[in-house]
Amino acid sequence: MEPKYWNINLEEMMEAGVHSGHQARKWNPKMAPYIFAERKGIHIINLTRTARFSSEACDSVANVASEGKQFSMVGTKYQAADLTASAAIKARCHYVNKKWLGGMLTNWSTMEKRLQKLRDLENKEKTGGFDRLPEKEAAISKGQLAKLKKYLGGIEYMASLPDVVTIVDQREESIAIKECITLNIPTICLVDTDCDPDLADIPIPANDDARASIRWISDKLASAICEGRKSYMKD
């Protein structure tokens, strides 16, 4: 796809608090190029850099989506969990929003078996299979299903490793980042002033704690993916 204008508005970013970083004493020096100033002990993110990298990220995901490739969105902390799920559902992406289980990507063969178990249990529940089990066995199966749905429900139908992973809060999702790096899966990360931008293929400098900031970034990426999918469907 040709690069597009993604309606990235500095005033909207200000209103969403995208510019508000962490306490200066907690910063990662690698974020220096993305910091505009320090105010009352808080680092202020340079929104022109945020706009540039947001646009680059949107172009990237739109291109990937236009080729019919798959995404996984990751955001498990409480501020991001429901926003991650809603953005992923909007863009028809897989997502992880409860807890990143070690080996989700690097131990994919085992994860595939867990996902098949989830689908089997779900099918058994829908067809009344639990009702035909002894009470204790039914309770165990229902417990297994609830646990699997909680942690794996967002990737239930992920048939292979994702082509791109988007991540909210790089520090919180350090295991996910490491697995992506190990497998050479490109990442787009929302990075606050305490993060290492070098770990992401496309870092988007932004407040990773405020819900409005997370929503703003997630919505832009989801919209760009949707645009890319439209192009793929036309072809």
Swiss-Prot record:
Q: Which UniProt keywords apply?
A: Chloroplast, Plastid, Ribonucleoprotein, Ribosomal protein
Can you tell which superkingdom this protein's organism belongs to? Eukaryota
Q: Is the Glycosyltransferase keyword given for this protein?
A: no
Keyword Ribonucleoprotein attached = yes
Q: Which Pfam families match?
A: Ribosomal_S2
Where is the protein localized?
A: Plastid, Chloroplast
The family database entries (CDD domains) matched by this protein are listed as: RPS2
Question: One GO cellular component from the entry?
Answer: chloroplast
> What terms describe the molecular function in GO for this protein?
structural constituent of ribosome
Q: Which GO terms describe its biological process?
A: translation
The record's similarity note reads:
Belongs to the universal ribosomal protein uS2 family.
Fetch the PANTHER family from UniProt: 30S RIBOSOMAL PROTEIN S2 PROKARYOTIC AND ORGANELLAR (PTHR12534), SMALL RIBOSOMAL SUBUNIT PROTEIN US2M (PTHR12534:SF0)
Q: What is this protein called?
A: Small ribosomal subunit protein uS2c
Recorded source organism is Huperzia lucidula
